[in-house]
Design a protein with these regions (language model features):
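Cap/insert and terminal regions of metallo-dependent hydrolase folds
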Residues: 59, 99, 105-108, 181-271
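Pre-active-site segment of Zn-dependent metallo-hydrolases
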Residues: 6-11, 34-78, 88-93, 146-152, ...
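Divalent metal-coordination and catalytic microenvironments
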Residues: 29, 39, 80, 87, ...
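Active-site metal-binding loops of divalent metal-dependent hydrolases
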Residues: 40-42, 81, 141-144, 179-181, ...
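Short, hydrophobic beta-strand segments that form beta-sheet elements in well-ordered domains
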Residues: 18-21, 99-103
Length: 279
């Protein structure tokens, strides 16, 4: 397993961390002195993004901040290289020396844009990040961007990611990000190989390209929660673009009917979820 060594910063807080919801699948995750930016997309409301295959989507909700508003970021964790997950603003304004952990496909496409520090992961592969006492193990989780083989072949590969935070050898917190996956059988392997997930960030929205749904609906997102069994779940990626056909209300309705023990929390753009750890 390769190791990314980050410069040690100021004294880190290992008692709690936070997830700041910027919009779509863009979050800022901070714990133990490590700051992670996920799926950076900063287009303004009303602007359009190219999703490929001649399909464009309009941004419907303004992101909570812009790149210039961010604190210092240590690395980017990217589900895949679609325009609503790494948009032209991110490509233009983000520091191109930032490490990017993603699929082989995404890392290959970001290189020509100047992002030369890519760390590609296949499913179940891991990369270790160290910063002072903090250790972050990032493992690629299985993702499937479409339920039928023909559509999946047209779309790019997608990863979920498991973030295991530790202080030295003491494991403190486990966070799962679904990425833009559909429901599929390999999600059951996540619960089997990686139980005790503390927090799940669940990509929903029912993204529809032409007539094909390529991300989970709200109801399917709740089913993913039931399968992976995080202690707490937060739905994201639910209302930002015109191709989303399943809003947050669909998730809420299904969550109310679910018998899962998971606590569900809801974040609007610009809100923060603070979590406490075992350490």
């Amino acid at each position: 397993m390769s190791v990314l060594q980050l410069p040690e910063g100021e004294s880190a807080d290992f008692s709690q961390g936070e997830v700041y919801f910027i919009g779509n699948a863009t979050t800022l995750i901070r714990f133990g002195g490590i700051t992670i930016l996920t799926d950076p997309a900063f287009l303004h409301k009303g602007q359009h993004v190219d999703l490929g295959h001649g399909i464009w989507a309009q941004r419907m909700v303004e992101p909570a901040c812009q790149v210039a508003d961010l604190p210092p970021v240590d690395l980017i964790v990217l589900s895949h290289y679609h325009g609503d997950h790494f948009d032209p603003v991110a490509a233009r304004d983000l520091d191109k020396d930032l490490p990017v952990i993603s699929t082989y496909d995404a890392v290959g496409k970001l290189g020509p844009l100047g992002f030369g520090h890519g760390y590609p992961l296949d499913t179940w592969d891991s990369h270790l990040v160290e910063k002072g006492e903090a250790r972050l193990k990032i493992t690629a989780m299985p993702g499937l961007h479409a339920s039928d083989d023909a559509t999946a072949a047209l779309l790019m590969p997608v990863n979920g990611h498991l973030l295991d935070f530790s202080r030295g050898d003491q494991h403190l917190y486990r966070l799962y990000i679904t990425g833009d996956t559909m429901l599929h059988d390999r999600l059951k392997d996540i619960a089997r190989f990686y139980p005790d997930i503390d927090l799940g960030l669940i990509h929903t929205g029912g993204t529809t390209m032409l007539v094909t749904v390529i991300t989970m609906t709200g109801e399917q997102g709740v089913r993913a929660v039931e399968i992976t069994r995080p202690r707490t779940a937060i739905p994201i990626h639910y209302n930002d673009f015109s191709v989303f056909m399943s809003g947050l209300d669909d998730f809420k309705k299904a969550a109310e009917a679910s018998s899962a023990d998971t606590e569900v929390r809801y974040l609007a753009h610009g809100e923060t979820y603070t979590f406490t750890t075992k350490g």
